[in-house]
Amino acid sequence: MTVESPPSDAEFDASQDQAPPACVMSFNASDATGAGGSAGDVATIAAMGAHALPVVASIVMRDTAEVFDHHPIDADVIAEQARSILEDVTISAWKVGFLGSAEGVSAVAEILSDYPDVPLVAYMPNLSWVEDDEQQSYLDAFRELVLPQTEVLVGSHQTLTDFLLPDWDNERPASARELAVAAGEHGTRHVLVTSVMLPAANSPDQYMDNILASPQGAITGEKFERFEVSFVGAGDTLSAALAALLGAGTDLHSAVGEALAFLDQSLDAGFRPGMGNVIPDRFFWALSSDEEDGEGEEDDDDGNGGDDDGDVDPDTDSDTDADADADSGDDSGPEPTDTPGAVTPPKVLRHIH
C-alpha cells in the first residue's frame, strides 16, 4: 500500500486560490450561554466569513436570564493571550467588549496602541449588574484609554447616554450627534447608537432608530418597529459583525447597513434554549432551501407569515426591546448549489469570502 505524504507548506500555499479570510481579534468575557461575550463574537465573526481570534478578559457567571457574578482575568494573562497570537497572525480589525476590570482595560488598551491603523469597534454593554465602585473605575478607564483609539463605539441609546453624558438632565433625550460629540471629545470617531425611541406618526406603536453618527451629524441609520421580546447577545452580535465587515475592507457606511441587516435576520431566527431570553441565530443562512420552504408552509398554516424581522436594544444583559424592519435585511435565501444540502451565506455577506 502506497501512503502519500502530506503536501509541503509551499505546495499548500500555492494550492490556495483565494486570500485567507480577514482575522478579527476579539477581547471579551467568556459567556457560557453562548449568547454574547467571546462565544457570541466567534459565532458572529465566523458567520460573516471572517476568522475570530478570541481573547478572554473575564469569566461571567450567568444564564440566559441574568448575570450572577464575574471573575476578571489577570491583566498579564490577557496581554499574553493576545501577544502570543499577534506575533503569528496579521489582524484586520479589533472588537472590544466587556474587559472585566480597569486593569484589564489598561492591558488591552496598551496592545491596541501598538496597532493604530487597525480599525477598532468597541461595544459598551449595560453594566448595571456590576458593583458601583468597580463599575465607575471600569468606565473611567475605558473612557480614558479605549475611546481615543475607537473607530466606532456601539451601544444602546440609554447606555451611551449614561456613559458619555452622565449629567444629562434635559427633558428631551440626547441626540445621536450629541452622543458622538461627547465621544469625540475623547477621540472616538463615530458612534452607532441603537434603540433610539421614536413615536410612530398616527399610531400607538413605538419605533426605534439605529443611527451611525459623527460629531458633525448623523450619517446613516435604520428605523425598526418595536416588539416586546427579550434577547441576550444582540449588542455583541452587531458590534462583532461590524468589526468583521470593516476588517474585510467594507466602507463604514455600507458596513453599518450590512451589520444591522445581519442582526435583524439573526434575531428573527433567534431561539430560546432555556427559560430566559432569546439568543440570536447567527447561522440563519445555513438553513437549507427545503427547510426554509417547510417552515414557510407551517407559518402560513398557522396564520403567522413570518414577517417578524427583529432588531433589538443590543445591551449585553438587558436586551428587552426587539424591533422589526421588513426592509432592513437582505431576504435572499441560500442560493442553489451543485451539492445537495450545501448552503452559502446570504448575498449581503458573500463579498467577504
What does each model-identified segment do?
Residues 3-4, 18-21, 72, 253-302, ...:
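Charged C-terminal helix
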Residues 3-26, 38, 42-129, 136, ...:
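Conserved N-terminal subdomain of the carbohydrate kinase-like
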Residues 12-21, 37, 205-221:
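Acidic-glycine-rich active-site phosphate/pyrophosphate-binding loop
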Residues 27-33, 219-232:
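Short pre-catalytic strand/loop immediately N-terminal to key active-site residues, enriched for Gly-Thr
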Residues 44, 162, 229-252, 256:
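Short, small-residue alpha-helix embedded
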Residues 49-53, 218-220, 245-259:
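Phosphate-handling active-site elements
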